Structure formats: C-alpha cells, structure tokens
C-alpha cells in the first residue's frame, strides 16, 4: 500500500489491527501482552499514514470471524482517511466473512471494477523517474 508498484488497492474482510485479536492469530499463540511489538508490527493499521494509493475496503456487516469483525475495516477506513489518504468503505448488509448473496457478489464486482477503472485504467500516467541504470 505504501509502494510505487501499485496504482490502487482493494482489501476485503481483512484484519488490519491485530491488537483487536489479543489472544493470538493464525499460528501466533502468544497474547498481545506477551508480544506487543509483534502485534503492532504485523498490523497494517499502524502503517495507514504511509498508504499513498487509493484503497477500497469491502466488508460484510455481519462478519462473525473473531479476527475480522467489521470494526477492523471501519478503523482502517478512518485511519487512512484521517491521514489524508483516498479510501472508500463498502459494507455489505447481512453478509458474513464470505459473501454469498448474489446481490452482494455482483455489488462487490461492480465496486472493484469501478475502483480499478477510476484509479488504474483511467488514471493519468505517472512521471517517469530516471534511475541511472
């Protein structure tokens, strides 16, 4: 997200702040209190101020995955926006971690295509910087 390799990004139902899952995640069994530096280091939220490309966040309003409650995307949205970044948050009603309703799937595809059309396909070209190679 804070690289020149991308023009825009899309993140769906993510875990952006690991301090919100204080009793472990994936293969990490230590708690937040046992490994606070790790929890902060692996949390994309802590790098929100570095996100310099447009970011689309999509999340199911009823996500009951303990690592990816909707508050994860809401907080990431506010962190990027609060730091001056371009960000959009789409919350899908009645959807959990995986989106199953036809309307939600179609809406997700619409949002993703519109995002890339706006920020990638129709984006003005970047200035080239000579690298001296």
Residues covered by each model-derived region:
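Active-site-proximal cap/loop segments of hydrolase catalytic domains
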Residues: 1-133
